[in-house]
Amino acid sequence: MIRTEKIMNKKIKPNKKIYVGNLPFETTEPDLKTLFSSAGDVMSVNIVKDRQTGQPRGLAFVEMSSQWEARRAISMLNRTNFMGKNLLVKEARTSLGFRGR
C-alpha cells in the first residue's frame, strides 16, 4: 500500500524510451540507431544481453529526444520487418525499482 502511494505521488515524466522486441540476435546498436533515426533524433540505444553469457537476448531499449519522436517511431516501426523478423516496438514501461534475479 505504501509503495502504491509513493508511485501515485510521483510526477510522471514524458516517456521517450521505447522497448524493441523480437530482434535478430546479430543486431548491433548502429543498426538500431540507423533504423530509428528515420523517426527523429536517437539519444541512446541499449541492446539487452544475458548477464552470464553476454549474448544478446533479442530485445533493446531506444531513447528518442522527445516523446513525440518516440510515439512517431512506435507508429512507424511496430511490426516492421527488420533483418527477417517482425519487430515489436512499444513504449517502454517505467521502472518501479524492481530488478530481475
Identify the residue ranges that each predicted region occupies.
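Intrinsically disordered, low-complexity RNA-binding regions enriched in Gly/Arg/Ser/Tyr
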Residues: 1-38, 43-57, 63-101
